[in-house]
């Protein structure tokens, strides 16, 4: 494909890379599905972990590095990738709260950060693999704190 053809669709190579990343993540890890919200969240965490271990993870690392110095890349990642993904996560968390599976007093965005943060920290800060066993362990521990508490007797 000629450079002129590429730049008719994307203003620069960073915009192309963001678009490619969004498409790769959408294919590898579609947003949490309807149905059982806790199962949807766990499935999404596992899919994100798998994507992070492959080419999408490597591309994300590169783009995050560039986003530190390029506000357009930062904005494109927020608008095209992180924003929509977070909306899907928040929707699933709200469904879990509405069903009584999660405490209603925890803000959904905070619950999402608690669930997904350890994966990104482990993969992109510590450079350690994010396995299915790790995802299950994180999910179980975080869920223990997010589940409704039994009423105390007086």
Model-derived features with residue positions:
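Short amphipathic alpha-helical segment with a characteristic S/N-K-E followed by hydrophobic residues
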Residues: 12-17, 27-28, 41
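Short loop-to-helix capping motifs
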Residues: 12, 66-71
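Hydrophobic alpha-helical connector segments
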Residues: 29-58
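Helix-turn-helix
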Residues: 1-14, 19
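Hydrophobic/aromatic residues within well-ordered alpha-helical segments
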Residues: 13, 20, 24, 52-56, ...
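Tryptophan-centric aromatic hotspots in well-structured domains and transmembrane helices
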Residues: 9-10, 77, 81, 116, ...
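Amphipathic alpha-helical packing segments from all-alpha helical-bundle domains
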Residues: 53-62, 72-98, 108-109
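C-terminal peripheral helix-coil segments that are non-catalytic and often amphipathic
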Residues: 43, 47-50, 87, 91-98, ...
């Amino acid at each position: 494909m000629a450079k002129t053809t590429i730049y008719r669709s994307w203003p620069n190579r960073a915009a192309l890379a963001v678009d490619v990343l969004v498409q790769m993540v959408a294919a590898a890890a579609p947003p949490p599905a309807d149905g059982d919200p806790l199962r949807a969240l766990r499935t999404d965490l596992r899919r994100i972990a798998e994507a992070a271990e492959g080419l999408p993870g490597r591309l994300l690392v590169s783009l995050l590095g560039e986003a530190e110095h390029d506000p357009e890349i930062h904005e494109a990642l927020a608008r095209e990738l992180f924003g929509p993904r977070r909306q899907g996560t928040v929707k699933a968390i709200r469904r879990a709260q509405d069903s009584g599976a999660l405490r209603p007093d925890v803000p959904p965005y905070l619950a999402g950060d608690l669930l997904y943060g350890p994966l990104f920290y482990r993969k992109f800060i510590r450079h350690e693999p994010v396995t299915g066993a790790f995802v299950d362990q994180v999910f179980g521990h975080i869920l223990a704190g997010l589940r409704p508490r039994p009423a105390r007797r007086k």
